[in-house]
Amino acid sequence: MKRKIVWALALALVLGAVLPLLGAGWDPNKEKEEIAKAKESVAAMKRADPALKTFFEKSYGYVVFADIGKGAFIVGGAHGKGVVWEQGKILGGASVTKISVGAQVGGMTYSEILFFKDKVTMDKFKEGNLEFAATAAAVMVKNGAAADASYDNGVAVFVMGTKGAMVDASVGGQKFGFVAK
């Protein structure tokens, strides 16, 4: 059993080092497509929970990951690309990589939005210093959920499933990357 855990952790470390490099660039040819997907995700989340409007109006900035793909069998990984807005203007692109270990199996895609309460938190994200286990703090988008949501250390996280199914009782973290436009 110890050997399996060691291998799982080693795999998680390797994936954690390699996956962020896959989404490291802001590709101007794909920029319009990424922005369109992000705007579609925002519209879908606002339809699902109109109370999200307050976060869009009052946050300093936010990042929208329209499609994060996640797959797992004991060791899990997820990766997605997003679009970053600061003070209402598109600032650049982002990537998210997640690694988890535990009882989990399946595959799914979902959308995720991170709202930054203030400039300090937004700057941490842009500098690559924002890393946390958001799955515990994330709010599932459904009617009225955002009304009771709040910032945790300057960040509010909302997720909405789009495709697939997964059984997940794991622990892990997220690492974010930012590329200015």
How should these model regions be labeled?
Residues 2, 19-23:
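Mature exported/compartmentalized surface modules and terminal targeting/interaction regions
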Residues 8-20:
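Bacterial N-terminal signal peptides
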Residues 24-181:
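Small-residue-enriched, tightly packed secondary-structure blocks
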Residues 1-9:
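Bacterial N-terminal signal peptides that target proteins for export
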